Amino acid sequence: MAAAEVFGGCVLEGSVRVSGAKNSTTKLLVASLLSDRKCVLRNVPDIGDVRLTVELCRSLGSIVHWDKQAEVIEIHTPEIHMSEVSAQFSRVNRIPILLLGALLARCPEGVVVPCVGGDAIGERTLNFHFEGLEQLGAKVAYDGHGYQAAAPKGLIGAYITLPYPSVGATENLILASVRAQGRTIIKNAALEVEILDLILFLQKAGVEITTDNDRTIEIFGCEDFYEVDHWVIPDKIEAASFGMAAVLTGGRVFVENAEQHLMIPFLKTLRSIGGGFSVTETGIEFFYNEPLKGGVVLETDVHPGFLTDWQQPFSVLLSQAEGSSVIHETVHENRLGYLRGLQKMGANCELFYQCLSSKACRYATGNFPHSAIIHGVTPLKASQLVIPDLRAGFAYIMAALIAEGGPSLIKNTQLLDRGYYNWVDKLNSLGAKIHLLSLDPVAF
């Protein structure tokens, strides 16, 4: 396992380029399996989840050429050679579950995918996926090792209402509907920018697909596809992460390729606590503007709300903001466990099982620590921490950048490689002092 020695007391200054979005690239690669035509993706980040998805597609029959220097992937899947996804992809991330929709579209006689993995931030149940696929005519079963699905009569368009605007379920049902007979309507769909990027990609491929502001997506089944050349949107999570690190350390960083329209809720909240930013045609400059002011209620939500993946790094900012602030996590029920690591560093925060905001969320009656109060300002001290998940990992790195009393040892940093391209070199180029280490697993 990997680890990093992170020295505190640095001020981040300079320029950094944000990469293509992880959560878009991986889904577009899966979407390419729907077509037997060539697809070209540009602005592709060389990160763990993308590498894994490429290998997954290759295992199914895709021909992939990846020019990593040019950040371009050319993928062509004239035939699906295997409709059973190898167990080697079990429990590593959540991409395999999307293959139920994509592979059923081309192999309705039956597909098998392994159990999913990903960040340990809650149950993230798959019921919405399975119920929607069954409405399209599929039969789905779980045997303890993976999921089997078949559509003996083929997939048939349907009217589907999701109980919650789940991103993964929306993506899966879109993929399954592309080759289904007739029209499919998905109500209460997620409309994250990565889903809109997927819709744009499918339109280029010849699919008749539209979306409305009332969370409705309409898809007409398609059999003939076009070649696609598509530019992946910039990663709004990476852009915000570097922006927060700049403000936290009292620095000034220009994030090239950051796009304002993808980050409106984040930028609003950052400004509300005193963080500075300036938008240009080529990116966004983030800077320390004034002492940070707390007293805010930060409630995560589906788009267009405050993104759950922004929440963890933002909590470090709140630990350095004057006053008490509230976090109410409404997307994932078990995402606040990382705060115990910040407490170890000296952050003054409390976890709560009830909803601490003006409205109750779907976890109000569950026994989940999904709210927190963070009291600032509290100095942070260097510590040894183990990263529990991807975004908590960046939060720990941020905290270590301002920690007093020697370097922090942050373990499990390989999780950061899943979503942040070249993160050590990028931060060090801005003035951070981070050394990667390789530790004996026994040390964990």
Swiss-Prot record:
Keywords of the record: Cell cycle, Cell division, Cell shape, Cell wall biogenesis/degradation, Cytoplasm, Peptidoglycan synthesis, Transferase
Enzyme class, broadest EC rank: transferase
Record organism: Chlamydia abortus (strain DSM 27085 / S26/3) (Chlamydophila abortus)
Keyword check for Cytoplasm: yes
Residues the entry annotates as binding UDP-N-acetyl-alpha-D-glucosamine: R94, D309, V331
GO terms, molecular function: UDP-N-acetylglucosamine 1-carboxyvinyltransferase activity
Protein name: UDP-N-acetylglucosamine 1-carboxyvinyltransferase
Protein role: Cell wall formation. Adds enolpyruvyl to UDP-N-acetylglucosamine.
Protein residues bound to phosphoenolpyruvate: K22, N23
The reaction(s) this protein catalyses: phosphoenolpyruvate + UDP-N-acetyl-alpha-D-glucosamine = UDP-N-acetyl-3-O-(1-carboxyvinyl)-alpha-D-glucosamine + phosphate
An annotated GO BP: UDP-N-acetylgalactosamine biosynthetic process
Gene Ontology cellular-component terms listed: cytoplasm
